[in-house]
Amino acid sequence: MRDNFIKNCYKKILAADSVYDIAIVSPTQFAPKLSSKIGNHLFIKREDLQPVFSFKLRGAYNKISKLKNIKHIVAASAGNHAQGVAMTCQKLRLQSSIVMPLTTPTIKVNAVKKLGSKVILSGDTYDEAYNFAIKYAKEKNYNFVHPYDDLEVIAGQGTIAIELINQLEEHPDYVFIPVGGGGLLAGMTVYLKTINPKIKVIAVEAEDSACFNLAYKNGKPTSLKHVGIFADGVAVKKIGSKTFKLTKNIVDSSITVTTDEICSAIKELYDETRVIAEPAGALSLAGARKYILSNKIKNKNIATILCGANMNFDRLRHVSERADIGESSEIILGVTIDELSLIHI
């Protein structure tokens, strides 16, 4: 049954070319400085170059463009899915309401408003905003679009993997994928593992919102008791049921990173590309650096996903201060890391 579920998802990914009505084919950029530093060939998939500065546009458009007889779209989001839904609805001339946590960065709230969507701020976390949005959509009889646990959304995100394979001369040895609710992980992993099972897929999570790790330990999606909000784009309490079903047996490994390690990766991305990634956007690189160092990987093709660049400017001082700590911890990490920090799947 699970194999059929994966096959169905793969077919949906291949049929998701409508995303290019609104999204770009983002470039995959070789990173010479980082490659030299880590002793591998490192590539960065630049999803920060999408019109809403995040990959989330793909899944939102793929889902909404297939809906029929729509009255009004409702979504819950910490920011990037919200912008994807808002831009999609603007293009398709649909009305939309977006429920966002009170902690959402102002840059994301304002971007959604500028795209013409109604913004409702509710709750301190994504999950609280989600619960309100579900209730609101039901009361109004509006269509709710899930940010990650929907096959059409997952398929839209999976188009990133198609581009990645087409853009590289050789298949990557490792692909590091950031995880919040698991939509990006599911879409990319299904495609990558279908075309080449030898590609190693590593899930990367912020250590204070590691819902995929918890689900794997328990064998099913399980709610975290606490969710950190520094990496707001992946601050999800519970992995999606569909995303976990698609990924639990085909993702090769999982790793978590600290806030300091994320800040260090933001700095490294700036030094390499002159782009300021949001915390979730730097998650993939942070995980790649930590995993490569701890496993002594050399001379491999490494693919990372810069999945978003929507961060308030006033957070930069905090990021700068923590980045130096993150770099220092990597030196210690090379000596002290043990297998307990990884879940091998």
Regions from the PLM with identified roles:
Residues M1-L342:
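PLP-dependent amino-acid enzyme catalytic core
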Residues I345:
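Short alpha-helical "recognition helix" segments of helix-turn-helix
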